[in-house]
Amino acid sequence: MWIDNKIFKEDMEYIIHANFINWENLNNKTIFITGVTGLIGYYLTSSLVYKNIKEDSNIKILALVRDIEKAKLQFKEQLKVDNNLSFICGDLNNIPSISEKIDYIIHGASPTTSRLFIENPVEVIQSIINGSQNILELAKSKNIKSMVYLSSMEVYGEYKTEEVLKENSVLKLNPNNIRDCYPLGKALVENISKAYFKEYELPVNILRISQTIGVKENVELIKNRKIIQEIIYCILNKKDIVLATKGESKRTYIYIRDVITAILLVLLSNKHGEIYNVANEKTYDSIYNMINNVIENVANNEINLLIKEEKTNKYPKTNYLKLSSKKLKEIGWSPSVDLIEMFRRVFSCNIK
C-alpha cells in the first residue's frame, strides 16, 4: 500500500504535518527501526519516506529485516522514490555489525501470533527479552539521541474491574499462565529499558499501545487474519463474523496514524525514562459491542455476529483494559480518529 491509495496518502499527510512533533530534529539524521514489515513498522517507515520526498528531510532509515527480498517487495513503491531507505539482513538474536552512525532507534519487532504464545512460549519469551537487550546494547554502543520501545496494553494483565489504567498501575500478570509469556516478556523488557536509563543514562521511552486499527495490505491476501483484519474481510465479502469467545473483554482502541504520531512525538521529546499509554479513551468498549457497532455503521447490518466458543487457552481471559492517555496528551499528543471512522477508513482502503 502506498500513496496511490487515497486513505493511505491522507494518513501520511496527517502524520508529516502533525504540529506537535519536532520533525526538524530528524532532518539529516539516521533512524534504526525493527519490525518494519508489521503494521506499525510499515506505516512508520512509510511516513519517514513520505517526509523525505515531500520536504527533502534527508532522514536515513536503516531497517533490520530477516528477509531482504520480502522487505524489498513490500516496500517496492517506497524504494522507487527514496534512496534513504535501506535494509540490514539479520534478526534480533543476531544483529550484524553496523558501521553507520545511528541517532535514533525504534524497537517494534516482536512475536504477535497468539498460537505461538501457547505452542512456542520459550522461543517467544527468549526472542522478546534477548532480542530487546541486544537492541538496548546497540543503542548504548551508538550513543543515540533517543530510543522508543513499543510495548503493549497486554502488560496490564487480568483486570477484572473497569478502573482507569495509568502508567503506574499494577501489572496483573500470572507466571503460571503460559500465554502470559508475551506480556511478561514485554513487561520485563520495560523494566530492563528503565534499568538502562537508570544505570547508563540511555535515553529510552516506552509506549504501551492499545489494540491498533489499520491495514498495510489488502486483507484478501492475508492467510492468517487477526481480529481486525477478519472483521474487514467479512464486511468486504458480506460474511458473518464468527467470534471464538463471548467478546466480553473491554479495551481501548487506536488508529494506526495516531500510533505513529505518538511514537514520533515521544522519540523526539526531551524527556526520557518514561512510560506512556497510547489510547483513544473514547473507544473503550467490549469486543462484542465494538463489532456490533461496526456491523451497524460500516456494514449497514448486512452481516451478523455469531458466537462459537472454542475451548482453548490461546485467547486472553475476560479482562478490562481501560487505558488513560492523559500523560501522553500532556506533552501535546491527541488522537484524531474515532472508532467508526477507523473502520470506515480501513474498509475504504480495501475496496477494489
Region spans (language model):
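SDR active-site strand-loop-helix element
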Residues: T34, I105-G108, M147-M153, L207-I209
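N-terminal Rossmann/SDR dinucleotide-binding element
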Residues: M1-Y104
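Active-site segment of SDR-like NAD(P)-dependent oxidoreductases
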Residues: P111-R115, M153-K160, S210-I213
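C-terminal substrate-binding subdomain of Rossmann-fold SDR/epimerase-dehydratase oxidoreductases
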Residues: M1-I7, I59, S86, I235-K352
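Conserved Rossmann-fold NAD(P)-dependent oxidoreductase catalytic core, especially the SDR/UDP-sugar
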Residues: Q133-R179
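Active-site helix of classical SDR
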Residues: C181, G185-L188
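NAD(P)-dependent short-chain dehydrogenase/reductase
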Residues: Y159-N168, K194-R251, I256-T261, L265-L267, ...
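NAD(P)H-binding glycine-rich loop region in Rossmannoid oxidoreductase-like domains
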Residues: C89-S127
